[in-house]
């Protein structure tokens, strides 16, 4: 990247020989402390950079509201009683699993002493190998269209929603 943007103020992840967690903390501290034009990190490090517990709570609540809207839509529009029960049960199970997973992440982050990704002042994300972030959770009345979702896709969704909401960007 330096050959393409020689005058750019950029931070590139490097390994110092200390633990990966220490390297990641150092990188997050540098990213938060300076006004970088470009920060380059590996996919694994990006995934380990968590959002703040407060933002994750907001995200969790927003997604749970989406689940509730889907459940209400089924209740209001599904004519067949058996189909209504089956779809409601399936969505409630997905909702409960999502909520449990998010609560575990929030608890883990709350106990940690890490700098959250949302304090790094980043305002744009470019993802190489985007196919690694596929399979975001999807709720549907049709079981074949419903998707459980991957943690990696959810992590990227959290960060992109943050940028869209906080920064007003449409990334």
Segments (PLM) and residue ranges:
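A short helix->loop->beta-strand "cap" motif at the edges of active sites that frequently abuts
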Residues: 122, 167-171
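Glycine-rich helix-loop-beta junction characteristic of Rossmann-like nucleotide cofactor-binding loops
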Residues: 163-165
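SF2 helicase/translocase NTPase motor core
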Residues: 1-160
């Amino acid at each position: 990247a330096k050959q393409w943007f020689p005058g750019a103020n950029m931070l590139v992840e490097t390994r110092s020989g200390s633990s990966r967690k220490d390297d990641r903390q150092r990188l997050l501290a540098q990213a938060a402390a300076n006004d970088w034009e470009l920060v380059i990190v590996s996919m694994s490090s990006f995934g380990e950079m968590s959002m703040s517990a407060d933002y994750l709570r907001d995200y969790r609540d927003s997604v749970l509201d989406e689940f509730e809207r889907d459940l209400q839509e089924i209740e209001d529009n599904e004519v067949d009683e058996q189909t209504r029960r089956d779809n409601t049960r399936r969505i409630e199970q997905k909702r409960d699993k999502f909520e449990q997973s998010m609560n575990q992440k929030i608890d883990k982050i709350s106990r940690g002493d890490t700098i959250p990704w949302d304090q790094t002042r980043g305002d744009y994300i470019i993802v190489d190998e985007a196919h690694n972030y596929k399979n975001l959770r999807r709720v549907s009345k049709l079981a074949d269209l419903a998707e459980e979702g991957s943690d990696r896709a959810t992590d990227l969704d959290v960060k992109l929603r943050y940028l869209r909401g906080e920064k007003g960007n449409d990334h």
